[in-house]
Amino acid sequence: MPEPAKSAPAPKKGSKKAVTKTQKKDGKKRRKSRKESYAIYVYKVLKQVHPDTGISSKAMSIMNSFVNDVFERIAGEASRLAHYNKRSTITSREIQTAVRLLLPGELAKHAVSEGTKAVTKYTSAK
């Protein structure tokens, strides 16, 4: 006799959707598909900047769309740059150039410096 399906614990605020098993008519279990999102990362940054501020699900959805859009723009531009230079690999140099081309003035400078800092931290941790 099959055991009854146990529901997964409630996800933390801003985390991915919990995977729960649902019963079909024929008794087989089917997993819900996971929805990938930047929500947990947006939430972590929000708490670093404004610890006492929350975010609505609609605002989180907008932030998720924004991050996806910026990611696609940078990836597309970096891909174009690699293609122009007859390269098959997108390196940090292509990403940096794409950021300089896409973001305006001071924002590009800050993004490049933060990116360089992140790459340095990553390589030193290896």
UniProtKB/Swiss-Prot annotation:
<keyword id="KW-0007">Acetylation</keyword>
<feature type="glycosylation site" description="O-linked (GlcNAc) serine">
    <location>
        <position position="113"/>
    </location>
</feature>
<keyword id="KW-0597">Phosphoprotein</keyword>
<feature type="modified residue" description="N6-acetyllysine">
    <location>
        <position position="6"/>
    </location>
</feature>
<dbReference type="GO" id="GO:0005634">
    <property type="term" value="C:nucleus"/>
</dbReference>
<comment type="function">
    <text>Core component of nucleosome. Nucleosomes wrap and compact DNA into chromatin, limiting DNA accessibility to the cellular machineries which require DNA as a template. Histones thereby play a central role in transcription regulation, DNA repair, DNA replication and chromosomal stability. DNA accessibility is regulated via a complex set of post-translational modifications of histones, also called histone code, and nucleosome remodeling.</text>
</comment>
<keyword id="KW-0544">Nucleosome core</keyword>
<comment type="subunit">
    <text>The nucleosome is a histone octamer containing two molecules each of H2A, H2B, H3 and H4 assembled in one H3-H4 heterotetramer and two H2A-H2B heterodimers. The octamer wraps approximately 147 bp of DNA.</text>
</comment>
<feature type="modified residue" description="N6-acetyllysine">
    <location>
        <position position="16"/>
    </location>
</feature>
<keyword id="KW-0238">DNA-binding</keyword>
<dbReference type="GO" id="GO:0000786">
    <property type="term" value="C:nucleosome"/>
</dbReference>
<dbReference type="InterPro" id="IPR000558">
    <property type="entry name" value="Histone_H2B"/>
</dbReference>
<dbReference type="Pfam" id="PF00125">
    <property type="entry name" value="Histone"/>
</dbReference>
<keyword id="KW-0325">Glycoprotein</keyword>
<feature type="modified residue" description="N6-acetyllysine">
    <location>
        <position position="13"/>
    </location>
</feature>
<feature type="region of interest" description="Disordered">
    <location>
        <begin position="1"/>
        <end position="35"/>
    </location>
</feature>
<dbReference type="InterPro" id="IPR055333">
    <property type="entry name" value="HISTONE_H2B_site"/>
</dbReference>
<dbReference type="GO" id="GO:0030527">
    <property type="term" value="F:structural constituent of chromatin"/>
</dbReference>
<protein>
    <recommendedName>
        <fullName>Histone H2B 1.1</fullName>
    </recommendedName>
</protein>
<comment type="similarity">
    <text>Belongs to the histone H2B family.</text>
</comment>
<keyword id="KW-0539">Nucleus</keyword>
<feature type="cross-link" description="Glycyl lysine isopeptide (Lys-Gly) (interchain with G-Cter in ubiquitin)">
    <location>
        <position position="121"/>
    </location>
</feature>
<dbReference type="GO" id="GO:0046982">
    <property type="term" value="F:protein heterodimerization activity"/>
</dbReference>
<keyword id="KW-1017">Isopeptide bond</keyword>
<keyword id="KW-0158">Chromosome</keyword>
<dbReference type="GO" id="GO:0003677">
    <property type="term" value="F:DNA binding"/>
</dbReference>
<feature type="modified residue" description="Phosphoserine">
    <location>
        <position position="15"/>
    </location>
</feature>
<feature type="compositionally biased region" description="Low complexity">
    <location>
        <begin position="1"/>
        <end position="12"/>
    </location>
</feature>
<keyword id="KW-0832">Ubl conjugation</keyword>
<feature type="modified residue" description="N6-acetyllysine">
    <location>
        <position position="21"/>
    </location>
</feature>
<dbReference type="InterPro" id="IPR007125">
    <property type="entry name" value="Histone_H2A/H2B/H3"/>
</dbReference>
<dbReference type="InterPro" id="IPR009072">
    <property type="entry name" value="Histone-fold"/>
</dbReference>
